[in-house]
């Protein structure tokens, strides 16, 4: 499979915990993501991970399993993935285009 570049928006949530807050879980997962060489950006509803498709999907699988290894019995992951073949575009590139259009 070709090394197609992708942007993946990932939201991972533990199910069945004693608290409505998930910040401890998010911090645990985010530390693991930051150990990866892939670029990532934490935001209010998840993390955007950038890189080759196979590497990004591999990391998502690893962090999902990591949640279980850390004692979370149920982990739910929502993933949105975007690719394009006409040009290379990072998450920041996409933001910059919109900000430029807003300022016009």
Swiss-Prot record:
Keyword Cytoplasm: yes
Keyword terms of this UniProt record: Cytoplasm, Nucleus
Domain of life: Eukaryota
One GO cellular component term: cytoplasm
Transmembrane segments annotated in the record for this chain: none
Pfam families tied to this protein: Thiamine_BP (PF01910)
Cellular localisation: Cytoplasm; Nucleus
Main localization category: cytoplasm
Record carries keyword Cell cycle: no
InterPro entries reported for this sequence: MTH1187/YkoF-like, Thiamine_BP, UPF0045_domain
Additional comment: Present with 1900 molecules/cell in log phase SD medium.
Record PANTHER family: UPF0045 PROTEIN ECM15 (PTHR33777:SF1)
Family assignment from sequence similarity: Belongs to the UPF0045 family.
Assembly description: Homotetramer.
Protein's recorded name: UPF0045 protein ECM15
Native source organism of the sequence: Saccharomyces cerevisiae (strain ATCC 204508 / S288c) (Baker's yeast)
Gene: ECM15
